């Protein structure tokens, strides 16, 4: 047995009937035969010293202890620039470009005849990969070089799901169709290797090849038929993908909403400071005016002092009334509801950003001012003509926006919590990879790229 590989103890047999299961061929020549554990066949010595060869039943999962050399070679062969859109790819490479000695059987009965690199990115799959040649006795090895998320492989009419991990290799007869179900998070990179009988095997075990030819074709034809189990699992993995994508998109949305909330609150905090500054300025101006009058006519001091206090109260009363009416109008206005109706929604997997009609907002608040100023105290029109009008307008809009964003954040969080609960362990096992994808997409939003 190759010291760089070991058979997986928990996952080694599909339980499916195999044509090799019925074929036992005997020879009496032990010369140059190595009795070694391998994933393709088993050699059994009988009491009469004859040797029996029993081909693989179903499929075998083995673990390759060290694939760094293979991974380094593959990385050099992959395209330097990756596509920005999710995709799949299959790249055929020369059979001698990568060291694959860990797939040797010990007797040189099988040689590498074809090598491909498969790439599957988040949200994509590769179904019905067919490597069968009529009458062949080939094996297929699918080695997982990289999987930064969840990747499941199923063989046609074999109910077992193989959740692939780095360094694990699935080996089976070539008459099985290969299905890589929807990739969830990140990407997976596989090395697909076809192993064909060597000349030595064809000479020594020709009867095995002959006896398997018809059975292999029979199984291949069966595997071409629709597989309800695979369709069911394919749909399940797609549903998992959609739920994970929902979490990712809404996580990005939450970060966006939190940023907008912070900015809006900070803006209103600044406006509050400007209100206070304006009050102080008005008070100072009135005091200054009263002092000038008092200097001219000391007798009027008491009367003017009362006038100053009355003016200050009147200005404060006017400002507070205007502010209260503006905010009340903003909170209850159907017009503003329509203006803010585009904040933000998910359409076909993408976030539709804020698209406020600023002119409509301005016109709305102007109408609010004119509608209410007739019932306000004297001085309202002077305030309306000043910069305070714009501050009130923005402040009212922001107060409504803050309430809207907080409600939206709450709804999004509830939806995400429900999805996370449904996913259970799948979410827990992939949480780090999900957070990584969220960070990458947030950076794309910041840089102005599309999701």
From Swiss-Prot:
Signal peptide range: none
Coiled coil: none
Biased composition range(s): Basic and acidic residues: 1-12
Region (Disordered): 1-20
Recorded family membership: Belongs to the poxviridae F11 protein family.
Purpose of the protein: Stimulates increases in peripheral microtubule dynamics and may increase the motility of the infected cells, contributing to cell-to-cell spread of the virus.
Protein name: Protein F11 homolog
Species assigned in the record: Fowlpox virus (strain NVSL) (FPV)
